[in-house]
Regions:
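Charge-rich, low-complexity segments
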Residues: 1-80, 87, 91, 220, ...
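An acidic, glycine-/histidine-flanked metal-binding catalytic module
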Residues: 1-17, 150-252
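Short, charged low-complexity intrinsically disordered segments located at boundaries
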Residues: 52-63, 126-134, 225-237
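Long beta-strand-rich cores associated with HINT superfamily self-processing modules
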Residues: 74, 86-206
Length: 252
């Protein structure tokens, strides 16, 4: 049996471990996001063995020196356990970033978009907007029975709900095309969809800002009404021409 098949067989035995790790990390993320008032969907997965084998084969071909042992493959593949945070509002990315840095031990972080190689099609839009993190669980934040999960890496991806949906479509079409590489027309359509997603993100940011402003306005009205009612209850009254007048002495 060749090395890559040996690795896949070994990984299959550890699949439940990585799935449990993802469940634990996702649970932590859900809790801190909820307590901070960030609306998001949090999902997790252990990497599918079939997809993992395809990825390892691709990476092995591109390496200057092929994998020499199973340990090398484990060290090279960072997303055996993955957690995805799909934000309802893209404007929450910065706050989510700080929460992740507080909750996990960060090995590496990367912000997209980035341009790693010249594209075959010149994009008009900027592509994938997201933050990726490679992390470990913090030992002080898990139960004693869960400390064994602190030894494995987790990849966390944070993007808007819209961006994650577009990314899934693009990834499957580009990396797993049914027949050959995509044509310029297909790439142009993907680019067009990306533009619609980016426009949607702007709309979501405006929606969030409008909602926050509405809440602030309602709170301001409530506070003013409460302030006025309190004064009247205690015998204080506003005078004509003044927004509010406070008089000293006992209520009479």
């Amino acid at each position: 049996m060749d090395l890559i098949n040996q690795f896949i067989d070994n990984y299959k035995k550890k699949f439940n471990y990585y799935e449990s790790l993802g469940r634990l990390a996702a649970g932590q993320l859900e809790a801190v996001l909820r307590s901070s008032g960030i609306r998001a969907m949090v999902t997790y997965r252990a990497k599918n063995p079939g997809r993992l084998k395809s990825k390892v084969l691709r990476r092995n071909v591109k390496r200057p020196v092929p994998y020499r042992n199973i340990k090398e493959i484990y060290e090279d593949i960072a997303d055996l356990c993955g957690v995805r945070v799909s934000l309802y509002f893209p404007g929450d990315r910065l706050q989510a970033d700080q929460l992740i840095r507080d909750q996990f031990h960060i090995l590496e972080s990367k912000q997209f978009p980035e341009q790693s190689k010249p594209p075959t099609y010149h994009k008009r839009f900027s592509g994938y907007w997201a933050n990726h993190y490679r992390v470990y669980l913090r030992e002080e934040l898990v139960q004693p029975s869960e400390k064994r999960y602190c030894r494995a890496r987790i990849e966390i991806q944070v993007a808007s709900v819209l961006m994650h949906a577009w990314s899934e479509v693009e990834h499957d079409l580009i990396y797993k095309p049914l027949q050959g590489t995509l044509s310029k027309e297909e790439l142009a359509i993907l680019d067009e969809l990306n533009g619609l997603v980016l426009a949607g993100e702007i709309a979501l940011e405006r929606l969030q800002a409008a909602g926050n402003e509405r809440i602030r306005s309602k709170n301001a009205v409530f506070n003013n009404q409460y302030f006025s009612l309190s004064f009247q209850k205690e015998g204080y009254h506003s005078r004509p021409g003044l927004a509010c007048a406070v008089r000293s002495g006992p209520a009479g």
